[in-house]
Amino acid sequence: MMEESGIETTPPSTPPPSTIGTSVAASTSAIFTPVPPVLSSPLAAPAFSPLPSFAQSSFSTPVPSSVPPLRTSVPLTYASPLPVTSVYSPPANTSVSAAFSSPLPAFSSPPSFPPPPLNTTPGPVLTAPPMNPPVGGFSMSSTYDITKGHAGRAPQTPLMPTYSAAPVTVLPNPVVQAPIAGIGSSITFPEEPEDPRVHTMHDEGSAGGIWGFIKGVAGNPMVKSVLDKTKHSMETVITTLDPGMASYIRTGGELDIVVTSIKEVKVSAVRDAFQEVFGMAVVSGEDGQSNIAPQPVGYAAGLKGAQERIDSLRRTGMIHEKQPAVSVENFIAELLPDKWFDIGCVIMDDPVHGIRLEAFTQATPVPLEYVQQAQNLTPQDYNLRWSGLSVTVGEVLERSLAHVSRTDWHVAFTGMSRRQMIYSATKALAGMYKQRLSPRIL
């Protein structure tokens, strides 16, 4: 049907190749793209596939009239008879003069140039611009300007370079390298003599393993002393901030003591004293009866009252017959003519070990007038008159003096409380008791 409509169906054929002597007129409106002949080269003979042809109207840029006709009769000049293995595609309407001595028309298809004749004089040799930074072992297989397209700067990665890797030297790490011998500080410090006990401890630890080391540390007297001081310091800090914590920290152990009173002034003083001496002790209070006058008079009455408190608890079954007990009893005594003093008696009774100890607090002076008032207030027919008075000295002082308590009037006369007096005497008693006990019990 295409033949009937008058349209030719013959495909366009490739225009015949133009010869080298053909000239292009200045008034031509389009540049014909000739296919240059492929010449055989003794060095390299690349094979090219047929190039596609373009229509005559594919280029519309007119050639200026000032351009003279191109002549290709001048022999081409090459820098070196190297085989052309790369294909260059320069832009259109640009004269290539990097490797030729005469201007050539711009090609739209990659040209293939024949090798130069043997009698051709070599032209000036163009060398590649120096690289920055220089790289050892760099070689170029072409004279192509690699700085083209990079504003005159050498690209970071050249297009077709081949590198020969330089030997890599591994630098030593400055952090781990050993210091240079012979270089030292001008400042010297005196060396302390080594303690032989430390070496002995380390030798025992290494010989017996970890348990031997622990045993050696635990058996070192210096370590024991440091640990004891540290423990004591911590307990002191805790008990200073909160005195009530002392009974919880030091309560425990095998030592169990009962105080024959429920008054805190007596129980707390005995507890602190025994825990101070033994480290840990269980101290509790039970209400024991003295069965003597409220205000004992004389040492014998004081001792009788303290012992009666212990016996009353054992008779009633409040404590075991073999239970160690501590009893405190205060009394007055005329140590000098018309000189009366208040004294506290502290006794320790341990039937299991057969230990009985007595101690006394410091003597607190009592004015004679207050003692006489207590004697006058006691009836003559008082049945316990043999042991003392029915009215205590503390009651008389509380009635006579303002801001004075019957239970702790000692601080008003001496500046030292009754509790501190009992604590001091009981601490001495606990020290004697510790010396009497067998080492296996401790």
Curated annotation (Swiss-Prot):
Subcellular compartments: Golgi apparatus
Give the superkingdom in one word: Eukaryota
Q: Which UniProt keywords apply?
A: Golgi apparatus
GO CC entries: cytoplasm; Golgi apparatus
Q: Which Pfam families match?
A: NTPase_I-T (PF01931)
- Region feature Disordered, mapped onto this chain: 1-24
Question: A GO term (biological process) for this protein?
Answer: epithelial structure maintenance
> Belongs to which family?
Belongs to the PRRC1 family.
What is the protein name stated in its UniProt record? Protein PRRC1-B
The coding gene here is: prrc1-b
